[in-house]
């Protein structure tokens, strides 16, 4: 598995990358946007998922407890999975 895999269930968002698996309850998600900052450095406390270098797109997932920055070259399929 090279890229980030995102799966949405009725109750949670499951993000898998390499050996990591992160589950985010959907009720905690505040906003999902494209992040225009370079390397996601605007929010220094955000959890970074994926390789920051060699990717062209960043997706920011804001939640009640923590923010997540996804580094990807396949933003369309990830956004489609999140917004499905």
Curated annotation (Swiss-Prot):
Origin: domain of life: Bacteria
Family annotation (InterPro entries): PH_SunI-like (IPR055365)
Alphabetized Pfam families for the sequence: bPH_8
Family from the record: Belongs to the UPF0457 family.
Protein name: UPF0457 protein BT9727_2307
Native source species: Bacillus thuringiensis subsp. konkukian (strain 97-27)
Phylogenetic lineage: Bacteria, Bacillati, Bacillota, Bacilli, Bacillales
